[in-house]
Amino acid sequence: MKSNLKILLKKELYEFKYNYKAWILTIIVICFSYFPNVRKSAMRDFTILAFIILATGQYIYNSYLTDISYNGILFLKNIGIKPVYLFFIKLLFSSILTGIIMLANIPNLKGVFSFSDIFWIYPIVVFSSAIMQISAAYVNGAENTASAIAITISFSMLICIFFIQVFFLKIIFSIVITCFFVFISIKILYSKIYRIQL
């Protein structure tokens, strides 16, 4: 199992390094967040988080779409790795992208977020990853439409979170909704593997 996990990790690392769309979008997002209009905006906190969701979501979407389009799911079955491991390894790399964007935005984040905000921010990033995976699984040749719908859902959830004023409820809501969609996304991966076996 450990050797198979290493194989999967190497595969995902290779894809992560050469996912040019995600890297280009990450650079654009970082540069755009330093525009004067963005830095002085009253919605700076929402804008930065929306940028993070956009960049990490694009990475997850492209990665899953590649797996589905080029028999990556079959590869997963052949090496005997459970779909849950695939989800969390992809989440690891999307978290790295999130970290890069947040580190690059430290001057913009000062006074906007506190450390405790990570308890609801990170679940939303995970939620976005799950939504992107689900949309990639049901793309059916309409890549742009599926991606746009997934991003819209993620942004809508982010808006809902911002409307919640009680910090504790914000954390609970983000964690519960994220756990639900992570469960759904992993079940969909299992169903993909099952259909390959038929």
Regions found by a protein language model. Give the residues of each.
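Short helix-to-coil transition segments within interhelical loops
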Residues: K77-P83
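Hydrophobic alpha-helical transmembrane segments of membrane proteins
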Residues: M1-N71, F87-L198
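Membrane-interface interhelical connector segments
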Residues: I73-F75
